[in-house]
Amino acid sequence: MVETRFGKIPTSFKLMKNGELPMVVTDYVANGSFAALKANVKLYQEDNYAYFIRNTDLKSGTFEVFVDKQSYDFLSKSTLYGGEIIISNVGDVGSVFLCPKLNKPMTLGNNIIMLRPEQNSLKYYLYIWFKWLYGQALIQGIKGGSAQPKFNKTDFKNLPIYLPDDNLLEKFHKIVDPMFELIDKNNSENQYLAAMRDALLPKLMSGELDVSDIDL
């Protein structure tokens, strides 16, 4: 074991920077200037081609903003497939989520960054690292702005991280993967039940659906 700013860690752990890890770090504005985004991205409050994933949606578990196919294609540098690590970098700085797998295409919203590790075994380690006390302290240490706290991708990429050797990382992944898969399954079931509720409730209120004969 060796003493570090994060406490004692195994000597086999490597000290690296986030930007040196084999992963994609991107955000909404990676797709173009603010003028280009305004001209090419249209948001909808009603159902459309793809979900526009925001920090507030990830917090609430409800996804109610959409983009059309043209906007989705324009935002190709921030496409989401599910399982990416998402971190809020404006306003509510440091909120960390795993992107859920939803029932249609998804694209990253504004004021958040997305991390997509090339190694699947890195995903949960990084998620837990950034939610952990010291990971959060590092993120809070790079935020600036008086009116609205924020941090940029460059500063984030320069943050230090201790990485286990590949063998230990793989063992860790095998232990936690079933746990996260169960969480994802439960979230999917909740999404399905919420959609069913939203579809049936208006019919019940209008009288189109009659449940008076159901024996409870």
Predicted features by range, described:
Residues M1-A35, N158, Y162, D166-E208:
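Non-catalytic DNA-recognition/assembly elements of restriction-modification systems
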Residues I113, Y124, Q140, P160-L163, ...:
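Glycine-rich beta->alpha junctions and the first turn(s) of the following alpha-helix
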Residues K123, Y134-A137, K174, E181:
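Hydrophobic/basic alpha-helical segments
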